[in-house]
Design a protein with these regions (language model features):
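DPxDG-like acidic metal-binding loop motif
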Residues: 102-123
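Short, solvent-exposed loop/turn segments at secondary-structure boundaries
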Residues: 23, 67-68, 102-105
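C-terminal nucleotide
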Residues: 1-13, 18-21, 32-85, 117-123, ...
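A short beta-loop-beta micro-motif enriched in histidine and acidic residues
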Residues: 26-28, 148
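Short clusters of hydrophobic/aromatic residues that line enzyme substrate/ligand-binding pockets
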Residues: 31, 97, 103, 162
């Protein structure tokens, strides 16, 4: 059995400047940190004693005889692209936090799934490779509308500021003293409101209005720079 975990993230500054439609014409910067709450995925080969080839357990239980008949879009997409053997698989998901909570759960799931299937294929991926494959799955296969900060924050972990431009994306570790880190933690409260929403609708609205909001996004970028300093 292979088990992978990926942290969720809290975004502090710069949201909206991590969209390609923005940073391909302007610069972008986000500041975020990973937290000690995780998305867990496990994978094991399924014995060929069952009337199905794939058994999935997430918020529902699902069985399927073919990858193309799997209902979960992310699992189906990743298996279709990277699972080349004929072995049956069981994949189980669990999480410290409910989905749709605004903490990067979608990207955390995709990153975990990519780590899982590549470990199964006996291949190691760098953090940058993980991010690029995650973006490819989410944007090109699942056609999701999202920025890039969640993929980087979940794959890299830690406390970082991320610079975006059309030629390069760079993750920079924020150097913070133990005292200041403990001060930040002791003065922060993470509360579950019970409200769940699909970020896809919010992100599509951001992209649709990005030309109208250029002044606001530029101001968000300047605030991010000030916060970094």
């Amino acid at each position: 059995m292979i088990i992978c975990k990926t942290p969720f993230r809290i975004s502090l500054f710069g949201g909206g400047t991590d969209f390609p439609i923005w940073f391909n014409r302007n610069n972008g910067m986000t500041i975020s940190f990973a937290i000690n709450k995780y998305c867990y995925l496990s994978l094991r080969e399924l014995p060929n004693l069952f009337p199905f080839k794939y058994r999935l357990r997430y918020f529902i239980n699902e069985t399927s005889t073919k990858i193309t008949k799997i209902k979960h879009p992310c699992i189906k997409g990743i298996l279709k692209k990277y699972h080349k053997s004929h072995n049956g698989l069981e994949i189980v998901h669990s999480s410290d936090i409910p989905g749709l909570s605004g903490l990067g759960s979608s990207s955390a799931f995709t990153i975990s799934m990519l780590k899982l299937i590549h470990k199964y294929n006996k291949k190691n991926l760098s953090k940058d490779q993980l991010v690029r494959k995650c973006i490819d799955i989410e944007h090109n296969m699942l056609h999701e509308s999202s920025g890039y900060q969640d993929q980087y924050a979940c794959a890299y972990g830690g406390f970082n500021y991320i610079n975006y431009n059309k030629n390069n994306i760079k993750v920079n570790k924020i150097k913070i003293t133990k005292f200041n880190l403990e001060n930040l933690i002791s003065n922060s409260i993470l509360v579950y409101s019970g409200i769940q929403r699909k970020s896809e609708l919010i992100e599509k609205d951001k992209i649709r209005n990005i030309n109208k909001n250029q002044e606001n996004l530029q101001a968000i970028l300047e605030i991010s720079k000030e916060a970094k300093n």
